[in-house]
Amino acid sequence: MRIEKLQQAYDIEPVLVHFPLHPETPAEGRDMTTFYAERGIDPEAAYARMKGLMDKEGLPYSRRSHTYNSRLAQELGKWADTQPGGYTIHDAFYRAYFVGAQNIGDTEVMIDVVKSVGLDTEAARDVLKERRFKDAVDAS
């Protein structure tokens, strides 16, 4: 991945900027066919373009049937950045969403991601329940 190549070549510390791309997306997600149709986008062309870009970077990318609201996952990502080794959550969320087509707005999916990278699941539940990193994402 480009960022890893940059880190190897230069003494840099990446900072991820979170932003809610489609905050109106409901908790259950939106069907991609409808999502594209509302925007006049050819779904096959959009997939082919993204797949080509991801292949070029060596990133896995799968076809998804739905788009999901990632706001809470972003808040959890901000929290993870404050934890030792927490940066690994970003790749895990990428894989859950863009490879596994999982709803990363679902609490149990998020907790599974937290567990998969070895972070404290109870602390993560508290972060989500109390929205502790809402302001941090808003400020990004």
How would you name each of these model-derived features?
Residues 53, 126-140:
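Thioredoxin-like thiol-disulfide oxidoreductase module
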Residues 87-131:
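Conserved acidic, metal-coordinating active-site core of Asp-based
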Residues 2-100:
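Structural alpha/beta surface segment adjacent to cysteine/selenocysteine redox centers
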